[in-house]
């Protein structure tokens, strides 16, 4: 299921016709996810997920950098605190790095995070509400 939000985070910077996006259960502190083994989240070092490894990702860019390429378009990040894919305080740190780009352009209201108590899941009502807000004008 994680390949779809991965595609969203990677396609949004490339395709300007996409007017708004939602990334569910994928946005992460990518450097830690890829190279820092930790019991609080799964790390690519200790799991068989080579299909998710992208060359250059570790040393050249991270998720907040991808968000900088989506900015100023609206983006919602959804993440559950109980999702073992990431440790939620690191997600908040990465989100704050991403907010910088929206803040600099004066469009901070276009970037939101839904950090909920659940796990690796989509909160459809929240996602649809966000998309309707930005696409139904």
What are these regions (language model features)?
Residues 9-10, 64, 96, 129:
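Active-site phosphate/pyrophosphate- and oxyanion-stabilizing loops and adjacent acidic/basic residues
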Residues 20-21, 77, 110-111:
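Acidic/polar loop patches that form or flank catalytic/metal-binding clefts of enzymes
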Residues 70, 77-79:
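Short beta-strand/loop motif that positions the catalytic acidic residue
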Residues 18-66, 72, 84-95, 104-107:
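Mobile cap/lid helix-loop segments that gate and shape the active-site cleft of serine hydrolases
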Residues 1-2:
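Conserved alpha/beta-hydrolase "nucleophile elbow" surrounding the catalytic nucleophile
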Residues 5-16, 131:
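Short glycine-enriched nucleophile-adjacent loop
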Residues 80-82, 116:
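Short strand-loop junctions, especially beta-strand C-caps/beta-turns
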Residues 96-137:
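C-terminal catalytic histidine-bearing segment of alpha/beta-hydrolase fold enzymes
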């Amino acid at each position: 299921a994680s390949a779809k939000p991965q595609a969203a985070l990677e396609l949004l910077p490339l395709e300007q016709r996409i007017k708004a996006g939602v990334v569910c259960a994928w946005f992460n502190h990518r450097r830690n996810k890829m190279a820092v083994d930790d019991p609080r989240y799964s790390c690519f070092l200790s799991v068989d997920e080579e299909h998710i490894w992208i060359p250059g990702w570790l040393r050249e860019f991270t998720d907040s950098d991808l968000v900088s390429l989506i900015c100023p378009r609206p983006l919602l990040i959804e993440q559950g605190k109980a999702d073992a894919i990431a440790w939620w305080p690191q997600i908040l740190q990465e989100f704050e790095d991403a907010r910088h780009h929206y803040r600099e352009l004066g469009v901070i209201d276009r970037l939101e995070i839904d950090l909920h108590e659940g796990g690796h899941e989509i909160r459809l009502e929240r996602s649809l509400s966000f998309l309707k807000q930005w696409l139904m004008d």
